[in-house]
């Protein structure tokens, strides 16, 4: 089920690191089509196996901190424009633990907005964290392409550093193999629960808006397949739509303009009782405005949060209450209801990107002090719930589709859906049929299928 494109791209990145060429070798969006990847299937299989074996169970050899021992934690996140919540989560961690340069423990950096075209920069920024002799853990959120290669190199030079991968965008097994902990949104259960939530909110159709690059991300491709299957089971119509990829030359403004111009006609075509969903953060803002104006349905963002798209879509000022999630939710709810979204628009009450960032820091601090286990699901849940008073979380392990076994260091998290004007839907209590956890996809086929969907993707 692994994507050949994703696996080969990750392997090439690992090879560049191993031979010391990361600093000079250009890696671009067309790397998957380079001649070096046209080797025989037998050679590819052998290289694949070798890379997997080289990283399997290659976990941190860290020691518990001594009382009063100085240490640092590295945080690499998206920028405000690509993922504000993760960035704000890093700011919260700095506020709580202090900057390393000012006597605290947090060393913070961001990867480029056009990370697909600047993979080398991402790798170098993550690797640079390990140059700090006091560094004990490195957390990346979101873990964009290049994270696996950087973690692999860090493990070779600094086996004592804990490596935490949040919201990964690379191959599941490779990500698991090079990380001490991986945490991602439970896109398996959410694939079903979001469609069920949409039906509870009155939807008769579910429209999935994305672009081919995102369908090359295994977890997103699986979730899309689950959503389509859930629509069949719940007697709803599944609609596949394209929008431009903001990381391409069209940029964020161009992609947002396209969606803003097309959401109205799509609502007119498919009807107000259609739930619209996009896999991209930057596209969320125009989608929310369009859904509210057209009276359609929006269950929750891809990376759910009351500040994911809502403030910018509806000009909501929240600077004076940043980090106060109950207060943020209250203000956003009032504005959304005023805009016509009562009972038709939702979110998670607390941001996934924000919560996962600060919760991961808290967890790592406890692990380094011998108070928690990095892969213990109860400890992970405790760290998340400590940041989200009143909201329930479901935490489980990712399943390795190749052998049906759980990946013990790969945690999936899900928070209950909050509908404005109605409250929590109780979605974390909804049982998800085991068949959805076993749905397999051919990622290459999914990419081609997306290219054939309605709309422009570049």
Q: Where are the regions a protein language model picked out?
A:
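Hinge/cleft segment of the Venus flytrap/periplasmic-binding protein
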Residues: 51-58, 331-458
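Hydrophobic alpha-helical segments within soluble ligand-binding/sensing domains
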Residues: 54-61, 181-207, 258, 328-332, ...
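Extracytoplasmic "Venus flytrap"
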Residues: 50-123, 139-145
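Bacterial lipoprotein signal-peptidase II cleavage site
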Residues: 22-33
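Periplasmic-binding protein-like
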Residues: 73-77, 132-144, 161-166, 207-209, ...
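Extracellular/periplasmic periplasmic-binding protein-like sensory domains
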Residues: 231-238, 285-369
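An alpha-beta-alpha
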Residues: 90, 187-240, 364
């Amino acid at each position: 089920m692994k994507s050949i494109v994703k696996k080969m791209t990750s392997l090439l990145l690992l090879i560049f690191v191993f031979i010391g060429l990361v600093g000079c070798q250009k890696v671009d969006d067309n790397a998957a089509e380079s001649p070096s990847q046209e080797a025989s299937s037998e050679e590819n299989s052998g290289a694949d196996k070798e890379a997997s074996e080289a990283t399997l169970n290659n976990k941190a050899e860290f020691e518990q901190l001594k009382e009063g021992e100085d240490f640092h934690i590295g945080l690499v996140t998206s920028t405000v424009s690509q993922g504000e919540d993760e960035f704000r989560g890093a700011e919260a961690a700095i506020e709580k633990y202090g900057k390393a340069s000012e006597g605290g423990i947090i060393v913070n950096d961001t990867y480029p907005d056009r990370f697909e075209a600047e993979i080398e920069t991402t790798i170098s920024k993550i690797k640079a964290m390990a140059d700090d002799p006091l560094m004990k853990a490195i957390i990346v959120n979101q873990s964009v392409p290049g994270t696996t290669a950087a973690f692999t190199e860090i493990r070779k030079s600094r086996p004592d550093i804990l490596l935490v991968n949040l919201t990964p965008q690379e191959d599941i097994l490779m990500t698991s193999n090079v990380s001490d902990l991986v945490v991602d949104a439970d896109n398996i259960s959410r694939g079903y629960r979001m469609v069920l939530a949409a039906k509870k909110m009155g939807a008769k159709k579910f429209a999935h808006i994305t672009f081919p690059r995102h369908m090359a991300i295994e977890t997103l491709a699986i979730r899309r397949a689950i959503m389509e299957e859930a629509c069949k089971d719940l007697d709803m119509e599944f609609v596949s739509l394209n929008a431009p990829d903001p990381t391409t030359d069209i940029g964020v403004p161009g992609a947002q303009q396209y969606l803003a111009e097309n959401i109205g006609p799509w609502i007119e075509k498919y009807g107000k009782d259609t739930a619209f969903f996009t896999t991209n953060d930057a596209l969320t803002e125009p989608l929310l405005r369009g859904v509210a104006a057209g009276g359609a349905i929006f269950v929750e963002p891809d990376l759910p949060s009351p500040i994911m798209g809502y403030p910018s879509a509806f000009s909501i000022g929240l600077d004076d209450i940043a980090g106060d999630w109950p207060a943020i939710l209250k203000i956003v709810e009032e504005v959304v209801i005023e805009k016509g979204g009562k009972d038709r628009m939702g979110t998670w009450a607390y941001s996934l990107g924000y919560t996962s960032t600060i919760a991961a820091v808290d967890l790592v601090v406890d692990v380094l002090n011998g108070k928690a286990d990095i892969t213990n699901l109860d400890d992970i849940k405790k760290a998340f719930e400590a940041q989200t008073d009143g909201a329930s979380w479901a935490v489980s392990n990712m399943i390795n589709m190749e052998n049906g076994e759980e990946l013990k260091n790969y945690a999936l998290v899900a928070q209950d859906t909050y509908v404005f004007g109605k409250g929590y839907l109780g979605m974390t209590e909804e049982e998800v049929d085991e068949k959805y956890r076993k749905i397999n996809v051919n990622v290459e086929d999914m990419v081609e299928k997306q290219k054939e969907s309605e709309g422009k993707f570049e």
